[in-house]
Amino acid sequence: IDVVGIRLGIAILIDCKHWKRYNSSSLTSAVHKQIERTKQYVAKTEGSMAVPVIVTLYQDKIDFIDKVPIVPIFQFSSFIDEFYGNIDQMKTIGTD
């Protein structure tokens, strides 16, 4: 987890990838690792809810993998602006 941002009780856990070239399998692996890290964060943070996010340097054809958003850095600002309106499309991990 490279960046954690919390607003309105929801944590956004961001993993930044600086890869110039990547394939879908390496991105899928990164997503699964980020989901596991997010689960660990939630387990250690009482009453929390979190969304795993991958930020990349470059645009790709892939927008989501397993409901985890893949966000090119140049679209990050608009992603954050629209985050709460689109949260139902994203993987949210919370404590019961």
Predicted regions and their residues:
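Intrinsically disordered, low-complexity Ser/Thr/Pro/Gly-rich regulatory segments
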Residues: 1-96
